């Protein structure tokens, strides 16, 4: 079960619940993946609903790696993610929000 105050969420991948966190290392890897793009631009795309499936996948990979699973992007391409693309997008948005909100601003 997730603790919204910890900044962590979980995702069911291939029927296994996986913890996710945007640790400093995971954020650094995400920045490399984004290339010329920025974390600020990624957050803005999620806030406005203008994110892409690539944004969701990059965020999911970073979160899973930050949660301790050494998964690759290519491994997730064929994985069964609970809720499908919409479920993945919802969890990615929760992860992003929890990573950047102060504890007193977080909502369950």
Model segments located where?
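Extended acidic/charged loop-beta regions that coordinate divalent cations
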Residues: 60
């Amino acid at each position: 079960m997730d603790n919204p105050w910890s900044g962590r969420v979980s995702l069911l991948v291939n029927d296994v619940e996986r913890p996710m966190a945007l640790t400093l290392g995971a954020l650094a890897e995400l920045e490399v993946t984004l290339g010329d793009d920025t974390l600020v631009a990624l957050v803005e795309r999620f806030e406005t609903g203008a994110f892409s499936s690539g944004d969701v996948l990059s965020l999911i990979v970073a979160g899973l790696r930050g949660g301790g699973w050494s998964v690759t992007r290519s491994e997730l391409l064929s994985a069964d993610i609970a809720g499908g693309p919409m479920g993945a997008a919802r969890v990615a948005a929760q992860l992003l929000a929890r990573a950047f909100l102060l504890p007193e601003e977080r909502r369950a």
